[in-house]
Swiss-Prot record:
Protein's name in the database: Acetylcholine receptor subunit delta
Catalysed reactions, as listed in the record: K(+)(in) = K(+)(out); Na(+)(in) = Na(+)(out)
Lineage: Eukaryota, Metazoa, Chordata, Craniata, Vertebrata
Organism of provenance: Homo sapiens
Record's function text: After binding acetylcholine, the AChR responds by an extensive change in conformation that affects all subunits and leads to opening of an ion-conducting channel across the plasma membrane.
Transmembrane spans: 246-270, 278-299, 312-333, 472-490
Length: 517
């Protein structure tokens, strides 16, 4: 009898020692997953008609970037899951007062919540951290993730725009009959409230340098028209309404564009003889084309709207093109001559009298004789009459050799002076015959100079018409440029996000305005 008794006692002692070799967590895990027969493929419900309540919350750690060309929002978040699994309950006193158990996520049932509007084809969470299981059956999972979600970009008011991006979560594995999605609930002063916003921890949040978060609401969307077994029946969407910080684009794009566009007004100050009027205008046009090309690389290739900066550049390019045409017309007017064009009286009155007065242009001084010139002209008549008498009294030989005789000391002429003609008519006829070639030559010179003066005056009139057109276009183009620029950019300045996240809903969806249940 002693042998069997000793054997049984030894076996009992070995069993006790084996149980003592396991720690409390290992014993608890064996109890939950082996002894109770836990199956992670089955939903944690007692009846198949029941649904599992899954609560979600989103904590934003960093808004990494928003790529407009790809229409992709990249965020660093922590997505918080919470549900109850009655199969994972235990009595903490029986297992060394263990109230929380940390398990790998592949050991328990998961609701398989995925990001529907992802933009990289990765639906699952890349890093699977441990799941916290509490002794009363509550399961808590907080995995980190970097999501690349699609965000339709509205480029209408770029760079004074704001965007409404969202992260839409749902379960692609279970329908609305099997799980019920809801927002996480917190408690304050014994009152509970749903967390209807994206959580941001000020200490752990990194602010984005380009975008400012204006609203961050969260909402459970249920489509009553969709059947219960449809994946589109329910979802939880976290919205990010963000506003662009335009300082970078103002300094690097807008200010250079505006300055270059306004340089085209200097074309009207350049004289036409410089030959650089069209060159300056075309240079401005090329610079605007380069800026338009740079901006097109920053925005998505969409035909839904034209960005604000694109509107300004197109407006400027059209205006500069018109300035180039005006420069060609001004140069054509400036280099006109009386031999090719006739300056009509109507054009003279409009461009040489009316418009210069309205545009406050200084008129050139009239080419009239000065008072001194008039005195000299009147006194010259006496010299001419004395010269005529002198020529009448002197013979031709005396006139020809008068200087030579004085040079050789001959004070007396060898020939007798010619006497004046007997009659005045004969004298006048002789004088007329002698002076006619000189008078004809003088008349030819005077007529030629008069024609040349008229030619130059009319050419100067064409130049003045060109200057008047330049000044008129300066007074027209400058206000058009200023008003057009102000009208275009004021649209963006007054383009502000709505005061509330959802139109028609007065609730602000922020932590300061909790809705207690």
């Amino acid at each position: 009898m002693e042998g069997p008794v000793l054997t049984l006692g030894l076996l009992a002692a070995l069993a006790v020692c084996g149980s003592w070799g396991l720690n409390e967590e290992e014993r608890l895990i064996r109890h939950l997953f082996q002894e109770k027969g836990y199956n992670k493929e089955l939903r944690p419900v007692a009846h198949k008609e029941e649904s599992v309540d899954v609560a979600l919350a989103l904590t934003l750690s960093n808004l990494i970037s928003l790529k407009e060309v790809e229409e992709t929002l990249t965020t660093n978040v922590w997505i918080e899951h919470g549900w109850t699994d009655n199969r994972l309950k235990w009595n903490a006193e029986e297992f060394g007062n263990i109230s929380v158990l940390r398990l790998p996520p592949d050991m328990v049932w998961l609701p398989e919540i995925v990001l529907e509007n992802n933009n990289d084809g990765s639906f699952q969470i890349s890093y699977s951290c441990n799941v916290l299981v509490y002794h009363y059956g509550f399961v808590y999972w907080l995995p980190p993730a970097i999501f690349r979600s699609s965000c339709p970009i509205s480029v209408t008011y770029f760079p004074f725009d704001w965007q409404n991006c969202s992260l839409k979560f749902s379960s692609l594995k279970y329908t609305a009959k099997e799980i019920t999605l809801s927002l996480k609930q917190d408690a304050k002063e014994n009152r509970t409230y749903p967390v209807e916003w994206i959580i941001i921890d000020p200490e752990g949040f990194t602010e984005n340098g380009e975008w400012e978060i204006v609203h961050r609401p969260a909402r459970v969307n249920v489509d009553p028209r969709a059947p219960l077994d449809s994946p589109s029946r329910q979802d939880i969407t976290f919205y990010l309404i963000i506003r662009r910080k335009p300082l970078f684009y103002i300094i690097n794009i807008l200010v250079p564009c505006v300055l270059i566009s306004f340089m085209v007004n200097l074309v009207f100050y350049l004289p036409a003889d410089s030959g650089e009027k069209t060159s300056v205008a075309i240079s401005v046009l090329l610079a605007q084309s380069v800026f338009l090309l740079l901006i097109s690389k920053r925005l998505p290739a969409t035909s839904m709207a034209i960005p604000l900066i694109g509107k300004f550049l197109l407006f400027g390019m059209v205006l500069v093109t018109m300035v180039v045409v005006i420069c060609v017309i001004v140069l054509n007017i400036h280099f006109r001559t009386p031999s090719t064009h006739v300056l009509s009286e109507g054009v003279k009155k409009l461009f040489l009298e009316t418009l210069p007065e309205l545009l406050h242009m200084s008129r050139p001084a009239e080419d009239g004789p000065s008072p001194g010139a008039l005195v000299r002209r009147s006194s010259s008549l006496g010299y001419i009459s004395k010269a005529e008498e002198y020529f009448l009294l002197k013979s031709r030989s005396d006139l020809m050799f008068e200087k030579q005789s004085e040079r050789h000391g001959l004070a007396r002429r060898l020939t007798t002076a010619r006497r004046p003609p007997a009659s005045s008519e004969q004298a006048q006829q002789e004088l007329f015959n002698e002076l006619k070639p000189a008078v004809d030559g003088a008349n030819f010179i005077v007529n030629h100079m008069r024609d040349q003066n008229n030619y130059n005056e009319e050419k100067d009139s064409w130049n003045r018409v060109a200057r008047t057109v330049d000044r008129l276009c300066l007074f027209v183009v400058t206000p058009v440029m200023v008003v057009g620029t102000a009208w275009i950019f004021l649209q963006g300045v007054y383009n502000q996000p709505p005061p509330q996240p959802f139109p028609g809903d007065p609730y602000s969806y922020n932590v300061q305005d909790k809705r207690f249940i």
